[in-house]
Amino acid sequence: MNDLLYFNGINASTGEYLTPPLRAEELAQLARGETIPPTQLLEFQWRKQQAQDHLGVKEGVDANDLAQAGWGVIFAHDADAALHDALRELLEHRKAQANQIKDRYREYTYRPGESKNLFLTRNGAGPGAVDPDKVPYYLLIVGDPERIPYSFQSELDVAYAVGRIHFDTNAEYAQYAQSVVRAERDDFSLAKRAAFFGVANPDDPNTQSSAERLVKPLAEKMSAQKNDWTFDSYLVKGATKSKLEGLLKNETPAFLFTASHGAGFEIGDARQFKQQGALICQDWDGPVAMKGKPIPQTMYYAMDDVTGDAHLHGLIAFHFACFGAGTPKYDEYSHLKANVRERFQIAPSSFVAKLPKKLLAHPKGGALAVIGHVDRAWGSSFLWNAAVEQLSTFESALTRVLNGSPIGAAMEYFNARYAELAVSLSSDLENLKLGKKVDAQQLANIWTANNDARGYVILGDPAVRLRVNGKTSHPPLERESLTLNIPSDAKLHVDKLDATLEKLENQISELAVTLKELRAAIKNSDS
């Protein structure tokens, strides 16, 4: 019997796993050194006790209504005023929504080294159910994880709906702000279509498991629940790079779920900042056939593959992949490697992955949000004890997303799971200190599941939601009537008429879209 635990993540420079497989007992030995601060444990215990329908807000507050739940933004202490100006369109839009009943819009500054508890205390709040009159429920972090750490984001996300944006230029911030506001203000809607993309590379237990036991059943469950949606599944041989290119270009759904390895690179590799977290597709022949061989970009989808003519506006994507959302400066799992006892540096600095940044700030209108993983993604997200499928967290969150809930509220299911696992892990560790026996397999499972649950983040405004109507993939077109005068004695070739009319209809539709885009461009230049 193979009792090895396999870890996600492929070293794209060597074609090998970033971390070799371990036995449960080896992993349990590592978990025994884990500690959870008492103040954080108290909040985890509170979060575990909360009923799911209350989400993170206090009783009587509708988390789907920004006028009740509130919205705030958190800038780094040294943020340039020009950054605020770049986001002005989004900030003014959210302020108008959050202040409809009471003043529930806030702008904050994060101080270096500040913990979540210190931040809340300084702003008049504390642990527990969110009171939007003190600190809004929806919070958007603006800045890179060196200035506002990932650890602060994950702590804050236990009770609040937190998202982050970080771009390289103010123009990209402005582009994202414009994309969100136009999706919510304009007559904008997408067809109710979702796509599920599941890679299963040869000789690779990780992706074979995620394709068969995460992507496939999740797509089936969603399809059974939402009969007014169209669900397309691309599994195994269908999960190629060319297919993903199509899904992120001219076949873009409203919601996209992918599961694959994320590409990892050694510190110092010139590709790390640009391509870490890129999605390795079915084109890769697996860790046996490709052992010792660098993975070429023809086998993975990176930021460079996002074309300028891609149609991404309104998309919400969920990438289950290592480093899919970002990379920390220090490896949280470096002690999984032989003879390593301390965390070591894996990147020059913590950073947000380039692929989702490119999707969010696309010049033709970007994605509204991308859900992904900071550091490694683990199979324990959907398998318990490596055998029992546990899809309820994914299923519940995706149901809320497809129902039109704000993405931050939908992800509360993941936050609740993290809190529950943290409490369980703390209990097991306490029993160990008291000399009680704890099963090694159980401890290993809880430890990996806890670390995995902590890593899910939202890139984008946590208050965005899908804009769908089920009828068309474009805003409704305003068409003038067209009259064709055909003499009654004209001789028509009926067998050619249908094809001719269809071609004419397509040309008229394309012209109408072009004219509408031109009107919008002229309007923007005038304003």
Tell what function each PLM region has.
Residues 1-29:
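Intrinsically disordered, low-structural-confidence terminal and linker regions
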Residues 22, 26-34, 39-42, 49-51, ...:
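A domain-level signal for caspase-like cysteine endopeptidase catalytic cores
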Residues 71-72, 137-140, 193-195, 253-255, ...:
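Beta-sheet entry/capping signal
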Residues 77-78, 94-98, 125-146, 218-353, ...:
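Catalytic-core segments of thiol-dependent peptidases
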Residues 104-129:
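Aromatic/His-enriched, Gly/Pro-containing loop or helix-boundary segments
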Residues 194-205, 213, 217, 221-224, ...:
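Active-site-proximal C-terminal subdomain of hydrolase catalytic domains
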Residues 484-527:
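Short, low-complexity, charged amphipathic interaction modules
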